[in-house]
Structure formats: C-alpha cells, structure tokens
Design a protein with these regions (language model features):
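Ferredoxin-type iron-sulfur electron-transfer modules in oxidoreductases and energy-metabolism complexes
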Residues: 373-388, 398, 402-470
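Short, positively charged and aromatic/hydrophobic N-terminal segments
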Residues: 8-20
Length: 470
C-alpha cells in the first residue's frame, strides 16, 4: 500500500487543503504486450451448467503427467466419478467418468493440438449415478492424506500445463514453500471464466487456496489484475469471513500479457527469477489457478473428482458467448447450436485456448479436457492474415520478451540447425507466450518456430542420453 500526500489550493478562499490518499501498489514485470482484451463479450454473463445434448462424452485417457492405461473396456457400465484410466507412475493423475452410462468405445480421437490420442467414449444414461469419495476435513487430516485426496481426485492444473497438483504441492524435502500464489490475472484476451468464478463463488476459491496453504505451510497471495479491481472487495470480504486476513494477501498486478504466466507472476510479485532449466518451486513459490482451487475445495468438501470443466466460449463468430461448466469430454461440436450459436460463414479460425497460446483446430470435433479454459470462434477481422516477410531486424520481439530472450536470434540459430547456439540463447527457457509473434511487424511465427526448435533440442538430448547409456 502506497500513501500519497497532496496539497490542494482553493483560490476563492486563498487556502490550502492537505490530502492523504492510500493507493495500492501495482506489481509488474519488464516487457510483455497489451493486446485488445475482448472480454466484454462474455464478462457479464453468468456461469451456467450444461450437459452435452447427445449425452455422449469422449474423455482423453491422459490429461497430465505419465500415460494412463484404461481400467474399463467397451461395454462396461460406469458411474459418474468412477476411475476409468490410471497409472502407477508418481507424476500422473487418474481420469474419471464424467457421466454415468456405458463405455461405447476406446480408440484414437482428435484432441486439442490437432493430435489423435487414446480416448474413452461414454454414452450417458441420464441417471446421474455417482461414485464420489467421502468428504474429508482438510484442516484435520495429515498432509499425506490431503495429497492422496488430491491425487485420487485427478486434479491437474487448470491454467494450461495440466501438471498433477499432488506432485506440485509435494516438492523435495529441502525445498521450503513460502507462498501459494493464486493466479487470478486471467491475462489472455477473451477468457473470462476465472473472473466469473471469482465473482460468483469466491468461497470455493478461497477455501481451495487455504487447503493448499495448509498442505504446504505457506502463506497465500492472490494476484489480481488491475482491470478486475471490482473483485477486490468481494475477495476481501470472503477472506475476512474465513478469518484468514493474516495469512492471505491480495496484490494488484498490471493488466498486460503474459502477466498470468507462472514465471512472470513470481517476478512481478517477489522480483525472483526461476533459474534457467529450473522450476518455479525453487523460488519458494507455487502458482495455482482459480479453477484448480475450486477443484481442490470440491474434492474435500464434496468428495468430487475433477470431472467438470468451467470455460469461456466466445469470439466474433460466436453469436451467443457463454461461460459454462460442462462434463470433461464434452465434444465442442455437440454444443452447437443447442448451447451456443455459431456463424459458420464468418468463422475463419477455431481455437482451443486463447488467441496467443491456444491451438488452431481443424475441426470442432474435439473434447473439452481438464485444461481447456476457452474455445474461440474468430472472424477474419480478429485474425492476422498478413503474409510472413523476412525479419526486418527491428528488435521489437526482444523488447517485449518477458524473459529477456532474443527470439529472432534463437530462430536464426534454429534455421541453420545450430542447436547448441539456440540452447545458449535460452530456447528451452521460452514459455511460448507468443508476445514476440504478436508484436512482429514481419508476421514471423516466432513462437511456432521456437516450439519446433524446442522439440528438436529435446530429441537431441534424448539421443545423447541414449548414446551415453549404450
């Protein structure tokens, strides 16, 4: 909290008035971009629960961590909340049936990223039979039992990476966690589901945050962007109601992209940098998403596994933008036109995710997964279709890179297959936020080229490791 002092002169009375104003400090980082927000399309629309009209879902077998193996087969009857795929690996998360019904088939299906992966298709029976866990008091159980509950609930991060939460909350013994950062920034354009969640069910968010704080013994910090300042009093009231104002602090961060990135939040709030090749936990911080906090609360209070996803459906070609909750595995095309109305003629781009980090999809026949925060139907006015031209050497990509990397130099090194040089330039540290491509006047798809380069680096490293073992 900053305190500003002013003297105001009133000429009619020839007097001075002393004024003291309290102003909340705004935290930020160097670089980043300011794209058009486009949040007004869905910001004021309440969240509604929706069931797929066909009553059929297609659930990816793996949605975070090591590959799962199906525990059911075609023809099996399942109930809502039943585990249908799991792994014995530590870094993994089970997958549960989101409706009750019958397993129709197990096979490859299109998912986000235009990949085809193993999925379990369930035909719902409309009975809504459930197999939830017994509720568990998070403040009267051991950390071991709490972590087991989170793992059994299949909770993964809902901010994009879908990393298993029980692993994230259980760092090496020599690592002290000082802060759980609740990421309420929601910095990417169009997406408003976190905003609506914080506005409509703040008690679930704060409860989930407190549970994660209890497990780790950390303090809590809520990072709220300054374009969502109307949520401040709502969150303050909830914190006071839970009598935890000594343990949870709200900090206002500047509204820009990619403010919601793990690394950028830690840099903004605590001026700490994640080491090259390291993990955020090495800074003493764990960043968790608003939706993840809600899932944690539900797992303990209701015994409910992560079988639903709250998301925004929006874009200029979406005639009825919505914030909805759907069963995990709901096929996007199944929501059209009964749930959302889309102008197919105006749609030139379909995205799973936001406009900067989302995947461009070839079809709407893909399932909403645990990590799907947004589906966008964009018009030609919303999409940059200008052709790529050679780099003009302006350096704008370097100016906006939040990590201080040189994207154009990295891409140049990758172009001539100089993997070693690209590595020294920090290619593996890139968070693929897309700021460089957004600002590039030459329309060079920098982040796509870097993403491919990172894959090549990983393959080369794996090859060297295999060669060394041989």
């Amino acid at each position: 909290m900053n305190i500003l002092f002013f003297f105001i002169y009133f000429p009619f009375t020839n007097s001075l008035c002393f004024v003291k104003i309290k102003v909340m400090k705004t935290y930020t980082f160097k670089g980043g971009v300011k794209p058009q927000e486009c949040k007004e399309l869905s910001k004021d629309i309440n969240i509604c629960e929706v069931l797929p009209p066909s009553k059929t879902v297609t659930i990816p077998v793996t949605m975070g961590g090591a590959n799962n193996v199906p525990t059911v087969k075609a023809g099996d009857k399942v109930v809502k909340g039943q585990i249908i795929a799991d792994s014995t690996e530590f870094i993994s998360a089970p997958v549960h049936a989101s409706p009750s019904g019958t397993v129709k088939e197990i096979g490859l299906h299109l998912v986000s990223g235009n990949l085809k992966v193993s999925c379990i298709t369930i035909e719902g029976d409309g009975l809504d039979s459930t197999s939830y866990m017994e509720p568990l008091d998070p403040f009267n159980c051991s950390s071991k039992d709490a972590l087991k509950r989170i793992r059994d609930a299949g909770i993964t991060g809902q901010g994009g990476a879908s990393f298993p939460l029980h692993v994230k909350l259980n760092p090496p013994a020599n690592t002290e966690i000082k802060y759980i950062i609740l990421n309420a920034a929601e910095c990417e354009p169009y997406i408003t589901i976190d905003y609506r969640t914080l506005k409509e069910t703040p008690h679930r968010v704060i409860d989930g945050l407190r549970i994660m704080m209890k497990i780790t013994g950390a303090k809590g910090v809520i990072a709220l962007e300054d374009n969502k300042i109307d949520l401040l009093e709502i969150l303050k009231a909830e914190i006071l109601k839970e009598n935890c104002s000594q343990d949870i602090e709200i900090r206002i961060v500047k509204s820009k992209y990619p403010q919601g990135s793990e690394k950028m939040l830690i840099k903004s709030l605590f001026n700490k940098e994640v080491p090259s090749g390291g993990l955020p936990v090495e800074t003493g911080c764990i960043v968790s998403n608003t939706g993840t906090a809600c899932a944690v609360s539900d797992a303990f209070r209701l015994g409910k596994p992560l079988i639903e996803r709250a998301l925004t459906i929006s874009g200029g070609a979406c005639e009825t933008p919505k914030n909805i909750i759907v069963p995990v595995g709901t096929i996007v095309s199944d929501l059209v036109p009964e749930v959302v109305k889309i102008n197919a003629e105006k749609t030139v781009k379909l995205l799973s995710g936001g406009p900067l980090m989302g995947s461009s999809m070839i079809s709407a026949d893909f399932p909403i997964a645990k990590g799907t925060a947004c589906v966008l139907f964009l018009t030609k006015e919303e999409v940059n279709t200008d052709p790529e031209i050679p780099c003009i050497g302006c350096g704008k990509c370097i100016d906006v890179c939040p990590l201080g990397l040189a994207p154009t130099l990295i891409v140049s090194a990758l172009k001539v297959r100089n993997i070693e040089k690209a590595g020294k330039l920090g290619v593996m540290d890139c968070v693929e936020c897309g700021s460089c491509g957004f600002i590039c006047p030459a329309n060079v798809p920098l982040v796509q080229k870097i993403r491919l380069g990172k894959a090549n680096v990983k393959r080369q490293m794996a090859s060297k490791t295999a060669g060394g073992k041989a």
